[in-house]
Amino acid sequence: MGLPWYRVHTVVLNDPGRLLSVHIMHTALVAGWAGSMALYELAVFDPSDPVLDPMWRQGMFVIPFMTRLGITNSWGGWSITGGTVTNPGIWSYEGVAGAHIVFSGLCFLAAIWHWVYWDLEIFCDERTGKPSLDLPKIFGIHLFLSGLACFGFGAFHVTGLYGPGIWVSDPYGLTGKVQPVNPAWGVEGFDPFVPGGIASHHIAAGTLGILAGLFHLSVRPPQRLYKGLRMGNIETVLSSSIAAVFFAAFVVAGTMWYGSATTPIELFGPTRYQWDQGYFQQEIYRRVSAGLAENQSLSEAWSKIPEKLAFYDYIGNNPAKGGLFRAGSMDNGDGIAVGWLGHPIFRDKEGRELFVRRMPTFFETFPVVLVDGDGIVRADVPFRRAESKYSVEQVGVTVAFYGGELNGVSYSDPTTVKKYARRAQLGEIFELDRATLKSDGVFRSSPRGWFTFGHASFALLFFFGHIWHGARTLFRDVFAGIDPDLDAQVEFGAFLKLGDPTTKRQAA
């Protein structure tokens, strides 16, 4: 046919058998990638420290998705929560990866079979003897089957009726585990952070899909609608399918970036808004205040703060700190976290407690400023010493640590105080191992950032694809210069324009 490279899909336009074949091959490629990627991640994943070196710090991308659906154990004898397991069963991480690879192989063989045996009776219109597809009927079948799968997932897998449940955690990402979830049928089901909404929405959407599928199987579209929406044209299917995909991609980009019950912070890392709003910092101070109210000492109160909670309150875990073109995991950036040094409390020579202003998300550098409880600047690390009034040396700032590895240790020499003031800009202070991975000290994004960027980008691309193919479908006659009621046989892609001498005409 002499088609240009970007017209490759035209060859399956009027060939239902091979259209099916290429879609099965596409499924084979997707499943094969998923299984292979899972095996690669399992080969490089270190499960030894789920608190300070969780999957999202290591740049794992497919392991979090398996985990949120209920997979927690490995055939290697480890569990994602840090324990050991003796009988992980078939549905371990490796089992899921293997299932995808086997499925990919079967799809590969099926694709070859359908490519070779393309001229099947099922694709033949008995009235004309030509290949054709009953697209409204196929739409009904797909809607019914996807509705069934959606309902089954919500009613059985998520609820634990037949399945493990899903990953559920507390608002601060400390106690997460896989557990069954009851559907939330009240208004709380619309809260994106309520796991019960996942069950109820899948049940409701699945029911709707089943009913809609049955409707489209039993009711034919009216002729005017059929013609108006070009329901006989396969490019209509392409256009509307692209619309469904880009819409879903925009939705999941939002739920990932802003956070939801479907994207737990234990699996994907915290969101940037939790840093911006001081979310974890407020909870830490609330716990410390509660401890002090129970007559605990500062040291005791801070020592009871979970290391996991303190680690979330560190800017290096903010997905918006990584540049778009900085490849690699968070561990390749600031290093592997080894331990929490403790919470630094700064005081001036008058005994006032000072607080270091934290670095906003989109700053790479930020002045070190210490303010008192009323927000008045009391000390800083000046850019020009000659004009300084509030330098650490002049104000006599000291630092004492509570909780963590440096619990009870205090420093008064200005060099050390300034060092910890700079580090306190970044949240809680951690010891980071940059030698093991040759980490360069430049922040990276978490899988939360990569997922969002990828899906938002492709959603935009697919949006234009929807417009393109939708317009081609609706205005095909205009673009081609062909009257839709013409009785000439026109093969799109084969002939450049009407009037081609090789165009066959139906016998009068």
From Swiss-Prot:
Name recorded for this polypeptide: Photosystem II CP47 reaction center protein
Family designation: Belongs to the PsbB/PsbC family. PsbB subfamily.
Pfam families: PSII (PF00421)
Record organism: Ipomoea purpurea
Function recorded in the entry: One of the components of the core complex of photosystem II (PSII). It binds chlorophyll and helps catalyze the primary light-induced photochemical processes of PSII. PSII is a light-driven water:plastoquinone oxidoreductase, using light energy to abstract electrons from H(2)O, generating O(2) and a proton gradient subsequently used for ATP formation.
UniProt cross-references to Gene3D superfamilies, sorted A to Z: Photosystem II CP47 reaction center protein
Entry's Gene Ontology BP terms: photosynthetic electron transport in photosystem II
Molecular-function GO terms, alphabetical: chlorophyll binding; electron transporter, transferring electrons within the cyclic electron transport pathway of photosynthesis activity
Superkingdom of source: Eukaryota
Annotated HAMAP family: PSII_PsbB_CP47
Gene this chain is encoded by: psbB
Subcellular localization, as worded in the UniProt entry: Plastid, Chloroplast thylakoid membrane
